[in-house]
Design a protein with these regions (language model features):
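C-terminal recognition in membrane/secretory proteostasis and scaffolding
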Residues: 284, 294, 298-529
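Non-catalytic architectural context of zinc metalloproteases
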Residues: 9, 38, 43-52, 56-200, ...
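Generic, well-ordered alpha-helical scaffold segments in large soluble proteins
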Residues: 183-194, 240, 244-248, 252, ...
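Early extracytoplasmic/domain-onset interaction patches
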Residues: 1-36
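Juxtacatalytic substrate-recognition/specificity segment
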Residues: 161-273
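A generic structural motif
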Residues: 23, 122, 487-489
Length: 529
């Protein structure tokens, strides 16, 4: 058994104190901190936050230590961890809460990863976690279970409801969740109807008010950061919560073979991220429609927005969905690069492709619901199984493995939905925020003007600009073929370019109900729970 202890001295320091006690399985046993965490398919640098380790620990590598001990000796090591950044996958400590994720905090002992773990938390604050509790001890089956079980300690509020034989708890810090109980009840009911069962007795949403939207799935819980003061807050909240809850089945229990068991020390590329995250996004938002929270037209408006996002990416013309999934590990969204032209989100295209696949299956008397039930019965999610159950090689060859244009008009027509496009206002193919260029579309006027991501855009056509909408405003009287002047700063210098406007205005997508009484659409969106 491995004994972990967590405490803190002063919340203003944002430092957790961690102690680990174990019997050394060998001489000089190694202790390792994960290089990434499940739910975030990128390598991360958690070890940079580790400091002040005891003298009996010696560092061997970026995230590897060894203990000064001989085989069979009882060892205790201590260290501190800085927890000053709040996101759903981090650990965080301030005067109102202690939020801890084991994948950031807890070293595992090489050779003892399958041993039972006990975590003692030294605090007078109440604690919420999915781990079973005996007194002040939290118990985990093994290290994987320990780090897949985040916890909140502090001044939280709780809303609870019963649904489908399980207790669902909304545990929140800095966010009022009372109004979400009934919508969440409907969402839970609809997702249970897809799979036919709810495989837990209790599920917890650990929710933090913050400055962004972010969620991470766990075995019997999820963590969410919700953006306080955001427009359409309730819709975003429910969409995120619905997405994370669907992971209870898809990914947490239907796990690709590549992740069984997890290798926390290295990247684990897979071509299935589109199914793991894209199908989850599809059902997350579909559940809002099926539960009645969204109207049919509101759901179609959401799908149209996702299609717009996808179609705005040049990468869709040369990068398959399977390859975008595989390449997710090398896409660092925090660093400036040409990501918009080289890659797109497997969440976005995965959701769009899942919707088109579902409608295609329904036209032949099947559905994606049935596919998910078969995969759930087999407790499997791998490429061969998905393709075998769907049994449509041409669809996969064209839209998952290939880069064929997606047949929106034809497939949405099956559901009595009309697909329409029109040109938006031109913006040189740029996305601009706070005066800084975030992306430049390949083949656009902005690319012809030699603009790069992270350039400071100073002026367009004689006007000062700070945002994409400012660029649109500056060009509202201009036409294709007109020559305009662009002023920007790069590498400490100011540059001016003259460029001829291309026909590169982005596309606006609209989905309209064309047939009021369409049997396929009615069955697709009807309430099931």
């Amino acid at each position: 058994m491995i004994h972990y202890a967590l405490s803190w001295r002063n919340t203003n320091e944002h430092l957790f104190d961690i102690a680990i006690r174990f019997i050394a399985p060998e001489d000089q046993p190694r202790l390792i901190l994960p290089s990434w965490r499940p739910g975030k398919y990128q390598l991360q640098n958690f070890a940079a936050n580790v400091r002040e380790w005891t003298p009996n620990l010696r560092k061997l590598g970026p995230n590897v230590w060894c203990a000064d001990a001989t085989r069979g000796e009882e060892v205790e090591v201590r260290y501190r961890y800085w927890a000053g950044v709040l996101d759903a996958g981090s650990s965080y400590l301030d005067r109102s809460e202690a939020y801890f994720n084991g994948s950031n905090l807890f070293l595992w002992i090489d050779g003892l990863r399958s041993d039972e773990c006990v975590l003692t938390v030294d605090t007078g604050w109440p604690i919420e976690t999915q781990l079973p509790r005996e007194g002040n001890e939290l118990r985990a089956r093994n290290y994987d279970h320990l780090i897949d079980s985040p916890a909140i300690a502090g001044m939280f509020t709780t809303q609870s409801f019963e649904e489908s034989g399980a207790s669902i708890r909304l545990v929140s810090v800095g966010c009022d969740t009372a109004r979400f109980v009934e919508p969440m009840r409907g969402i839970v009911r609809e997702q249970v109807a897809v799979f036919g069962e709810l495989p837990v007795n209790e599920y917890k949403f650990l929710i933090h008010g913050g400055d962004r939207w972010h969620g991470v799935e766990h075995e019997d819980s999820c963590s969410m950061i919700v953006k306080r003061g955001a427009a359409d807050f309730d819709e975003h909240f429910l969409s995120l919560a619905s997405h994370e809850f669907f992971h209870l089945w898809n990914v947490k229990r239907m796990m690709p073979a590549a992740f069984a068991p997890y290798d926390y020390t290295a990247a684990t590329p897979t071509r299935l991220l589109w199914a793991m995250e894209g199908i989850t996004s599809y059902y997350g938002d579909l559940s809002l429609a099926r539960s009645g929270y969204w109207s049919e037209q509101r759901y179609l408006r959401h799908l149209a927005h996702e299609i717009e996002l996808l179609e705005s990416s040049h990468a869709r013309t040369h990068l398959s969905l399977a390859q975008a999934s595989f390449d997710g590990w090398v896409q660092d969204v925090t660093r400036p690069h040409d990501r918009g032209n080289a890659w797109y989100s497997f969440y976005t295209k995965g959701e769009v492709v899942a919707a088109l696949l579902d409608l295609t299956l329904r036209a032949r008397g099947m559905s994606l619901d049935e596919v998910m039930r078969v995969l759930w019965a087999e407790r499997i999610l791998d490429e061969d199984a998905v393709r075998r159950v769907v049994d449509d090689p041409l669809f996969f060859a064209s839209y998952v493995d290939g880069v064929e244009p997606l047949p929106y008009e034809t497939i949405f027509a099956l559901a009595g939905v009309r697909f329409e496009t029109r040109r938006k206002r031109r913006a040189l193919g740029l996305k601009v925020k706070d005066g800084v260029i975030e992306s430049v579309a390949s083949g656009s006027s902005g690319a012809a003007a030699d603009l790069l991501p992270q350039d400071e855009l100073l002026g367009v056509h004689g006007l000062r600009v700070h945002s994409t909408s400012d660029v649109e405003h500056a060009l509202q009287e201009s036409n294709t073929g007109d020559e305009i002047e662009v002023v920007f700063a790069r590498n400490g210098g100011v540059m001016t370019r003259r460029v001829r406007l291309e026909d590169d205005a982005p596309t606006e997508v609209r989905l309209h109900i064309a047939e009021e009484d369409n049997a396929l659409r009615r069955e697709w969106l009807r309430r099931r729970g």
